[in-house]
């Protein structure tokens, strides 16, 4: 799994289309427990054509690009004509930031809020389990008017290992990047030894974020995107 991470060597991150934070809560300082953990992930387009297609898919069948391209689509051009057959057009994911720390509830809420503000997060993901509800409620009560929103995520019936396996293909396809930092190494290291490592808090946040992005259609690969758009244009009569 380590070899599948792409190394981001540039000094700055690219412009992100979406920034998602993923939280695994503990809000206890007991040393025998996993600490709370937060990872921040950015989605960025491979090229301009990807932005065109993404804008179409994610905005209820309305093109956000210029009028010329919109006219081409209205005249019956396939989206494949706008999106070159290039792997670079697949959206990429960047691990932008992470931390782990044992904190009581007030300190945890404050640190999460500060992180979301500093990283310009759009959505904060929190697992919808009983242990996380107090954190979610406090964040909504104190920071409900901030630019970032809180999204509760149902993990479903799958266990932690199954959830990570469900997004493993994203790593093998080479679309996930991380900078050369100590905090990024902590995330990569936990993923590498999972499920045999001492802690798995960062792994949980990783699978939660990637699974959310995949299931909400943000991380759609080029062939899937073309098929979806072309399929949406097929006229279906009444049964």
Model-based region annotation:
Residues 37-39, 44-194, 239:
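Mg2+-dependent endonuclease catalytic cores in nucleic-acid-processing enzymes, primarily RNase H-like
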Residues 7, 210-239:
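Acidic two-metal-ion nuclease catalytic site recognized across multiple nuclease folds
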Residues 23-36:
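An active-site-proximal beta-strand-loop segment
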Residues 26, 129, 206:
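Anionic group-transfer/hydrolysis microenvironments
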Residues 32, 118-121, 176, 200, ...:
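Intrinsically disordered or highly flexible coil/loop and linker segments, enriched in small
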Residues 191-223:
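Acidic, Mg2+-coordinating catalytic module of metal-dependent nucleases/exonucleases
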Residues 1-25:
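ATPase catalytic-site recognition across NTP-hydrolyzing enzymes
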């Amino acid at each position: 799994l380590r070899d599948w991470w792409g190394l981001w060597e540039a000094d700055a991150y690219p412009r992100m289309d979406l920034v998602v934070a993923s939280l695994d809560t503990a809000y206890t300082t007991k040393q025998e427990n996993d600490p709370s953990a937060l990872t921040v992930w950015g989605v960025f387009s491979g090229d301009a054509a990807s932005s065109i297609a993404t804008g179409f898919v994610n905005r209820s069948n309305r093109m956000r690009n210029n009028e010329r391209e919109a006219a081409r689509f209205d005249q019956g051009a396939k989206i494949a004509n706008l999106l070159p057959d290039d792997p670079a057009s697949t959206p990429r994911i960047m691990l932008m930031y992470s931390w782990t720390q044992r904190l009581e509830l007030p300190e945890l809420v404050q640190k999460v809020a500060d992180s979301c503000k500093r990283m310009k997060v759009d959505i904060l993901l929190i697992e919808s389990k009983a242990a996380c509800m107090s954190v979610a409620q406090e964040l909504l009560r104190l920071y409900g008017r901030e630019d970032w929103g809180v999204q509760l995520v149902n993990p479903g019936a799958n266990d932690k290992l199954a959830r990570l396996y469900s997004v493993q293909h994203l790593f093998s396809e080479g679309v996930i990047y991380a900078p050369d930092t100590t905090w990024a190494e902590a995330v990569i290291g936990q993923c590498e030894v999972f499920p045999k490592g001492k802690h798995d808090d960062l792994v949980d946040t990783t699978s939660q974020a990637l699974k959310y992005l995949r299931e909400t259609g943000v991380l759609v690969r080029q062939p899937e995107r073309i098929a979806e758009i072309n399929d949406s244009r097929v006229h279906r009569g009444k049964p």
